[in-house]
A protein has these predicted regions:
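Surface beta-strand/loop "capping" patches
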Residues: 127-162
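Residue-level structural signal for beta-strand termini and adjacent loop
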Residues: 46-47, 138, 163, 185
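Accessory beta-strand-rich segments of carbohydrate-active enzymes
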Residues: 1-133, 160-161
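Beta-strand-rich binding/interaction modules
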Residues: 34-36, 148-185
Length: 185
């Protein structure tokens, strides 16, 4: 059956006007619909089960919805995949609906877990940034020999404003003190 998570918070006095506020969820499991101060922030106003999958990250720009003073409310509706209603599977433990969490369905020594681990299964938090944010950075290493490594850095850049921005992406890879910098227009 569906169930709700709900919490309230106030912005700290150190919050600076003109900054973006992002609401992050590291993991939600199965189906999730997100609300902020009574407004639906995932999918469309009439859609349901907007975030669908196992252990999915979600990020929402709540800058225009946040109250600078007073209480802000976050609510998340979680819906588990009810196997009996969603498909005619012969798997009574729900593994067909939870392939990434076989342990949640029970195997060998572990009993079945009601709800198949549905819910908010990671951290939820706010991040305050400028208009341009870096998302999902990673470093790939190719090792042609044991004495040499070729590194490539990749990331997505999101401009949340309506005007073009110029930014510099820079960083240092440790160990080795390997620095990099790139102008982005």
């Amino acid at each position: 059956r569906p169930f709700w998570y709900r919490t309230e918070f106030e912005l700290p006095s150190s919050y600076s006007e003109g900054k973006r506020v992002w609401l992050h969820f590291d993991n939600t499991n199965r189906f999730a619909d997100f609300y902020f101060n009574g407004e639906k922030i995932s999918g469309t106003k009439t859609s349901t089960k907007d975030v669908s999958g196992h252990m999915l990250r979600s990020k929402f720009d709540v800058t225009n919805l946040i109250k600078k003073s007073g209480k802000n409310v976050i609510a998340v509706l979680i819906t588990d995949a009810d196997q009996k209603k969603t498909r005619k599977a012969k798997d009574p433990y729900g593994v067909a609906c939870s392939p990434s969490y076989l342990a949640g369905a029970g195997w060998d020594w572990m009993p079945y877990v009601p709800g198949r681990l549905a819910g908010i299964t990671g951290n939820a938090y706010l991040v305050v940034t400028g208009d341009v944010v870096m998302e999902d950075p990673w470093v790939r290493s190719e090792l042609p020999t044991l004495q040499k490594a070729e590194l490539s850095v990749s990331t997505d850049i999101r401009n949340a404003s309506s005007s073009p921005k110029e930014v510099v992406v820079s960083g240092v890879i440790q160990p080795g003190n390997i620095s990099f910098s790139k102008d982005i227009r």
